[in-house]
Curated annotation (Swiss-Prot):
CDD domains assigned to the protein according to its UniProt record, in alphabetical order: CYP86A
This protein's name: Cytochrome P450 86B1
Alphabetized SUPFAM superfamilies for the sequence: Cytochrome P450
This protein's record includes keyword Cytoplasm: no
Gene designation per UniProt: CYP86B1
Length: 559
């Protein structure tokens, strides 16, 4: 038999004649040859697509795959620290790149960390870059028409009213008194219980409870009692946290997908629906109760919480705000006041343990302030329970610098979103079309050598000091509190809250992270620690405090 003749076949022989062959062996070989040719064709197509996608990476920062766009790279980034991944991409692309999502998806966006671009969209061309429909639709179920999800007149009205209230004497008195109560009569006893039992404690959870109670007092005028000796589970607090966690998933998922999940009531959409019901039930009950109380009191000015203030106002038609609108206002302020400060403090204490020289300088600064009191003396310096007053808190420049440095490296809101209202061009030359989405990466901004220098990854509070006094940076370089017309209204209060809490803890305890505890950010609206912050607390001895007190006489020690 001539075996060579079995392989000497034409294309037509393979695809049209093989079935008529009477030789089973030849038939099998023909089918095998056809399969090999198809496989070779598929491999060639894959190699071509891969080479094309990788070539696109040179110009667009990431490979661009047919149909999928840059989604595979995003999926890879989501497996680890998504914010570090994004920072690396932005660094390679000189601060700006255009993300391409799957075909027919809503994930296309321009991402930037260039301060020139950030100032352009937050200040110079503010009216061209509203939150936009994409952002509002993703968070409408949770935030409704509240200040962080609103644009135009709705946003302006809420901001104007809140701004007046935030600067009132009654509001400052409310915040000062409520914070003192929470820190010295609830927080410290909880921490002391942990010390006495020699058991670790989740400091992030404790701080979230503290700020949650504090902001509920300010926003709703109620005390949920979240921070207590037995660390009770508060349904509203749990529902609120679950809702924010589920809502953020919409930003990394095509709109059609999460809407389909919502229709089927499955996955994160089911969780979001259930959580928002818990939030709404709490808010509705508070609003109903407050209306009854005010009808009996007959005068809204006796209270200074935001809910009562807005209840006393009228809309453009002269009518009272709806319960839904009141709910949206309060939920938005709780989101801002609860998460941002507590998350920032958690990262601050983690960084503090890694940088003991910073902790020492904070202690020296506090001892110096105690020494400067009119009634200072040996009794004062050895007093283990000092209470720092508002004016003394303001003098803590180095502590504020350390907190700002923590916020630079780990901003509470790592990214934020805008939508382009009309065709525009960024200062760096990036072209923007009407309807485009823009993301400014606040986390990445703190890690750019071009912005902060070669030591940008170091925790160095001294970069914020000028002749020993705290000096803030441009809001378009340090964007932890946003910038332009949307600059955070509660910035001063947030610093006061963080400084008061940090001072009370640092002066009394050394905070040591539990060995082996993994610290990494969680994908959420704010940058929670994914596994909390498990720490052991150690009481400071009087002799240790005396050593810091002695160093406080050296005027140049902190600088």
């Amino acid at each position: 038999m001539n075996f060579n003749s079995s392989y000497n076949l034409t294309f037509n022989d393979v695809f049209f004649s093989s079935s008529s062959s009477s030789d089973p062996l030849v038939s099998r070989r023909l089918f095998l040859l056809r399969d090999v040719q198809i496989l070779e064709l598929l491999i060639a197509i894959f190699v071509f697509v891969a080479i094309h996608a990788l070539r696109q990476k040179k110009y667009q920062g990431l490979p661009v795959w047919p149909f999928l766009g840059m989604l595979p790279s995003l999926a890879f980034g989501l497996r680890g620290n998504i914010y570090e991944w994004l920072s690396d991409v932005l660094c390679l692309q000189n601060g700006t790149f255009q993300f391409r999502g799957p075909w027919f998806s809503s994930l296309n966006s321009t991402i930037t960390c260039d301060p020139r671009n950030v100032e352009h969209l937050l200040k110079n061309r503010f009216s061209v870059f509203p939150k936009g429909s994409y952002f509002r639709d993703n968070l409408r179920d949770l935030l409704g028409d509240g200040i962080f999800n609103a644009d135009d007149e709705t946003w302006q009205r809420q901001r104007k009213t809140a701004s007046i209230e935030f600067h009132s004497a009654k509001f400052r008195q409310l915040t000062t008194q409520s914070l003192f109560e929470l820190v010295h009569k609830r927080l410290l006893p909880v921490l002391e219980t942990s010390v006495k039992s020699s058991s670790p404690i989740d400091l992030q959870d404790v701080l979230l409870r503290l700020t949650f109670d504090n902001v509920c007092m300010i926003a709703f005028g109620v005390d949920p009692g979240c921070l207590g000796p037995d660390q009770p589970v508060i349904p509203f607090a749990k529902a609120f946290e679950d809702a924010t966690e589920a809502a953020v998933v919409r930003f990394v998922m095509p709109t059609c997908v999460w809407k389909f999940m919502r229709y089927l009531d499955i996955g994160t959409e089911k969780k979001l629906k259930e959580s928002i019901k818990g939030v709404d039930d709490f808010a509705d009950e508070v609003i109903r109760t407050r209306k009854k109380e005010l009808s009996l009191e007959g005068e809204t000015t006796k209270r200074s919480d935001l809910l009562t203030v807005f209840m006393g106002l009228r809309d453009e038609k002269g009518e009272s705000f709806s319960d839904k609108f009141l709910r949206d206002i309060c939920v938005n302020f709780i989101l801002a006041g609860r998460d941002t400060s507590s998350v920032a403090l958690s990262w601050f204490f983690w960084l503090l343990e890694k940088n003991p020289e910073v902790e020492e300088k904070i202690m020296v600064e506090m001892c110096k302030i105690l020494r400067q009191r009119d009634d200072h003396g040996n009794a004062e310096k050895s007093d283990y329970e000092p209470v720092f007053g508002p004016e003394e808190i303001k003098k803590m420049d180095y502590l504020q610098a350390a907190l700002s440095e923590a916020l630079r490296l780990y901003p509470s809101v790592p990214v934020d979103h805008k939508e382009v209202q009309e065709d525009d061009v960024f200062p760096d030359g990036t072209m923007l079309k009407k309807g485009d989405k823009v993301i400014y990466a606040i986390y990445a901004m703190g890690r750019m050598e071009a912005i902060w220098g070669k030591d940008c990854l170091e925790f160095r509070p001294e970069r914020w000091l000028r002749d020993g006094r705290f000096m803030s940076e441009s809001a378009y370089k340090f964007t932890a509190f946003n910038g332009g017309p949307r600059l955070c209204l509660g910035k001063d209060f947030a610093y006061y809250q963080m400084k008061s809490t940090a001072a009370a803890i640092v002066y009394r305890y050394k905070v040591k992270v539990v060995n082996g505890h993994k610290v990494e950010p969680k994908l959420a609206l704010t940058m929670y620690m994914k596994h909390g912050l498990m720490v052991n607390l150690i009481n400071r001895s009087v002799s240790e405090i005396d050593q810091y007190y002695a160093k406080s006489f050296d005027e140049g020690y902190i600088n």
